[in-house]
C-alpha cells in the first residue's frame, strides 16, 4: 500500500513538472494564453484586411527543391475567416499555388497566424513582397523563431499567435465558380489558384 502511494505521488509530481514546461514556452516570451471564443476582441472582417502573418513548418530543417534547408516559412495574408465549422472553432486561410509557404502548409499538421504591432509594419511588408526561396526572411528581419508544444513555429516579436490544426486542405476548383469575381481574379493571377486551409483553433496567446 505504501509503495503504491509513493509511486502515485511520484507520477503526480512528474506531471506537475512536465505540464508547466509545455505552457511556459510562450509565457517566457511574454505571451499569455487566452480563449478565442471568449476574448477575441477584433472585428472578424477587418482582422484579415489589416493583414496577418501565416507560418508553417517545424524546427527540423528539410531540403528544398532549390537545395536550401529551411525549417519554416512565413508569408503575409489578407484573405481568411474565423468562425465555427464542424462544431470546432475554425480559422481559414488561403495560399496561392506558387507561394513558397504552400510547401510548408502541405507538409505540416499545424500552422500559426500572427499579428504584429503597427510599428512593425515593415515585417508584414517584407514578408508579403519577398520570397523565402531567395533567403531566410525571418533572419533578414531579425525575427526570433520559437515553437509551441506541438512544434509549430511562430515569432516571439508577434503580439498575438493563433495555433491551428489543419482539418481540411484543397485548391479551389474552377468548375465550382458561380460568378465572374473569381474567374476574373484568376484570369491573370501569376501566383496561381489558391488553396483553402481550414484549421481548428487549438491554442491562442497574446501579449
Give short role names for the model-derived ranges:
Residues 20-25:
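Sec/Tat signal peptide C-region and signal peptidase I cleavage site
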Residues 26-207:
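Active-site-proximal mixed secondary-structure blocks
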Residues 1-10:
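Bacterial N-terminal signal peptides that target proteins for export
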Residues 1, 18-19:
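Short intrinsically disordered, low-complexity coil segments enriched in acidic
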Residues 9-18:
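Bacterial N-terminal signal peptides
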Amino acid at each position: 500500500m505504501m509503495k503504491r502511494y509513493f509511486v502515485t505521488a511520484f507520477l503526480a509530481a512528474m506531471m506537475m513538472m512536465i505540464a508547466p514546461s509545455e505552457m511556459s514556452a510562450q509565457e517566457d516570451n511574454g505571451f499569455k494564453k487566452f480563449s478565442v471564443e471568449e476574448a477575441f476582441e477584433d472585428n472578424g472582417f477587418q482582422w484579415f484586411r489589416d493583414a496577418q502573418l501565416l507560418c508553417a513548418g517545424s524546427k527540423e530543417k528539410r531540403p528544398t527543391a532549390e537545395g536550401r534547408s529551411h525549417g519554416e516559412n512565413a508569408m503575409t495574408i489578407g484573405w481568411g475567416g474565423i468562425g465555427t465549422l464542424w462544431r470546432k472553432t475554425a480559422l481559414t486561410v488561403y495560399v496561392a499555388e506558387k507561394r513558397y509557404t504552400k510547401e510548408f502548409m502541405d507538409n505540416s499538421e499545424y500552422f500559426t497566424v500572427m499579428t504584429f504591432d503597427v510599428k512593425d509594419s515593415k515585417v508584414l511588408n517584407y514578408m508579403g513582397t519577398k520570397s523565402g526561396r531567395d533567403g531566410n526572411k525571418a533572419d533578414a528581419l531579425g525575427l526570433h523563431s520559437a515553437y509551441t508544444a506541438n512544434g509549430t513555429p511562430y515569432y516571439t516579436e508577434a503580439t498575438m499567435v493563433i495555433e491551428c490544426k489543419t482539418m481540411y486542405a484543397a485548391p479551389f476548383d474552377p468548375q465550382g465558380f458561380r460568378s465572374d469575381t473569381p474567374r476574373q481574379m484568376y484570369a491573370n493571377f501569376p501566383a496561381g489558384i489558391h488553396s483553402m486551409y481550414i484549421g481548428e483553433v487549438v491554442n491562442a496567446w497574446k501579449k
